């Protein structure tokens, strides 16, 4: 996805088109923070190229706040969102209606999970080619530029069937003793899905289409929830918690803990977004960029680590139903006349990023070329 910063992005020099990522397993390595931190130097697999290593001092990004409780939100918010999303795709939402106690419980259980011994976490080990499960620095999937993190990802389906996919995942994968985890994260994902639909109404108004259009498009969704843990690192200037990338999904809703780490590439420089416990960080993903025909930007971002404190965050990736055809609404196409991206389904894009391509600044463009070149049927 190379729309916002194609010529100056540090990630562009290392993007890996048309590579079978499942075969990149030449130097398997176990990421165990408690053991790695006893070493004076981090393994070479975690050291990033000089041009991609984190900067010491960077400015703070001026991110607009969207107050969802304000009666004027449907009047002023679309203009503010449009301004942010045509430039970098990031904004904050406050007074969002999500229970503070639910957020606190989700953070508490996330900390409890990552504090478990490695063997316990590996019961949920992600399988090759899949997007969900426990992943320790993507070891086994990649062999270079490994991120200094561990994650737990799981699917959420909002299909009006009353299914409890998240709750079932924890019980089936980790055992009945994780029933409370399943209940909390099921409720959290449902809250994130509802919040996403509210934001979709504002995005529709921002783009000049019916406010119900995108809400209806995502009413049923096959989304992904991810818990992120970035342990302290003895040499944080050599590595990254998450490398530069654009999210392939449609919309990301992120809640950070109190530790700085999120950085966005805007105006040819990295800028940070300060943690705010009262706010969710929202950003546009590649799929919604395609839905807007390139009007709204999916922006390059990354996560850095530090020597003193662990950082944790929770990311909800809103995605359409896997068989839903992604194409801009007619209102947008009538104004722009030309299509920037081919029709595709989320299942096609997800497979591309899991099996053929390591997400970076060029993901959407590379995927579009892949679809056209291979004449992939929808």
UniProtKB/Swiss-Prot annotation:
Binds 1 Fe(2+) ion per subunit. The keyword Phosphoprotein does not apply. The keyword Iron applies. Its EC number is 1.14.11.-. It is an enzyme of class 1 (oxidoreductase). The active site is at residue 311. PROSITE patterns: FE2OG_OXY. GO terms for molecular function: gibberellin 20-oxidase activity; metal ion binding. Residues 11-25 have a biased composition (Basic and acidic residues). Pfam families: 2OG-FeII_Oxy, DIOX_N. Induction: Negatively controlled by the level of physiologically active gibberellin. Up-regulated by auxin, paclobutrazol, long day exposure and cold treatment. Keywords: Iron, Metal-binding, Oxidoreductase. It catalyses: gibberellin A12 + 2 2-oxoglutarate + 3 O2 + H(+) = gibberellin A9 + 2 succinate + 3 CO2 + 2 H2O; gibberellin A12 + 2-oxoglutarate + O2 = gibberellin A15 + succinate + CO2; gibberellin A15 + 2-oxoglutarate + O2 = gibberellin A24 + succinate + CO2 + H2O; gibberellin A53 + 2-oxoglutarate + O2 = gibberellin A44 + succinate + CO2. GO terms for biological process: gibberellin biosynthetic process; response to gibberellin; response to red or far red light. Expressed in inflorescence and developing siliques. Detected in seeds, roots, cotyledons and leaves. In seeds, specifically detected at the rim of the embryo and the outer integument. Residues 220-320 form the Fe2OG dioxygenase domain. GA53 is less effectively oxidized than GA12 and is only oxidized one step to GA44. Involved in the promotion of the floral transition, fertility and silique elongation, but plays only a minor role in elongation of seedling organs. Acts redundantly with GA20OX1. Belongs to the iron/ascorbate-dependent oxidoreductase family. GA20OX subfamily. This is Gibberellin 20 oxidase 2.
């Amino acid at each position: 996805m190379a729309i916002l910063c194609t010529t100056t992005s540090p990630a562009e020099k290392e993007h890996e088109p048309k590579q079978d990522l499942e075969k990149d397993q030449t130097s398997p390595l176990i990421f165990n923070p408690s053991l790695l931190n006893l070493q004076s130097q981090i393994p070479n697999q975690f050291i990033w190229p000089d041009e991609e290593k984190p900067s010491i001092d960077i400015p703070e990004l001026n991110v607009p706040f969207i107050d969802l409780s304000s009666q004027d939100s449907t009047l002023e918010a679309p203009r503010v969102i449009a301004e942010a999303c045509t430039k970098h795709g990031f904004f904050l939402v406050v007074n969002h209606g999500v229970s503070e106690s639910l957020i606190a419980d989700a953070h508490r259980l996330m900390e409890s999970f990552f504090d478990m011994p490695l063997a316990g976490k590996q019961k949920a080990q992600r399988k090759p080619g899949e997007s969900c499960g426990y992943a320790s620095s993507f070891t086994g999937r990649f062999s270079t530029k490994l991120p200094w993190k561990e994650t737990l990802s799981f699917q959420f389906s909002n299909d009006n069937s009353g299914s409890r996919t998240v709750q079932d995942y924890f019980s089936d994968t980790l055992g009945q003793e994780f029933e409370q985890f399943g209940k909390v994260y099921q409720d959290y994902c449902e809250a994130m899905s509802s919040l996403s639909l509210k934001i979709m109404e504002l995005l529709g108004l921002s783009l000049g289409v019916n406010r119900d259009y995108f809400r209806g498009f995502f009413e049923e969704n096959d989304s992904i929830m991810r818990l992120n843990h970035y342990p302290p690192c003895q040499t944080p200037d050599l590595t990254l918690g998450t490398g530069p990338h654009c999210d392939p999904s449609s919309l990301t809703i992120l809640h950070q803990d109190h530790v700085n780490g999120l950085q966005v590439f805007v105006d040819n420089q990295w800028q940070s977004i300060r943690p705010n416990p009262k706010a969710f960080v929202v950003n546009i993903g590649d799929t919604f960029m395609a839905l807007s025909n390139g009007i709204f930007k999916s922006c390059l971002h990354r996560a850095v680590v530090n020597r003193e404190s662990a950082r944790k965050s929770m990311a909800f990736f809103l995605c359409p139903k896997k068989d839903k055809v992604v194409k801009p609404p007619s209102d947008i196409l009538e104004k722009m006349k030309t299509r920037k991206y081919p029709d595709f389904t989320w299942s096609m894009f997800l497979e591309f990023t899991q099996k053929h391509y390591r997400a970076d600044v060029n993901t959407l463009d590379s995927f579009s070329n892949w679809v056209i070149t291979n004449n992939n049927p929808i």
